């Protein structure tokens, strides 16, 4: 039996009830009761002036910074430290992190929608 021989008249789905949840969604849109707040394009979350988060780099931030920087180095970005025969981008990124020369800013988002920007050179790195 091939696809050309099948008869799909659309009558096979007569016994299915319509979903009433869609009607509720349509009614909410008609009444103007949206739960979404739309901000103007110029209005963005503000950076906190006084920092409240810890000055320590987390292991997740460290992994993300090293991975991002290693990818940049692999794609021929300029290296910020003197090379002593290293060719592995990850090892070069680790050397840059130890020398605090990675040109990346970490943005930490807070629950109220604001954020804090920390330079890699400002954070305390534990090994």
UniProtKB/Swiss-Prot annotation:
Can you provide one Gene Ontology molecular function annotated for this UniProt record?
Answer: DNA-directed RNA polymerase activity
Where does the record say this protein resides? Nucleus; Nucleus, Nucleolus
Where on the chain is N-acetylserine found, per UniProt? 2
- UniProt xrefs under InterPro entries: DNA-dir_RNA_polK_14-18kDa_CS, Pol_omega/Rpo6/RPB6, RPB6, RPB6/omega-like_sf, Rpo6/Rpb6
Q: Does the keyword Transcription apply?
A: yes
Q: Record's family?
A: Belongs to the archaeal Rpo6/eukaryotic RPB6 RNA polymerase subunit family.
Q: What is this protein called?
A: DNA-directed RNA polymerases I, II, and III subunit RPABC2
Organism of origin is: Homo sapiens
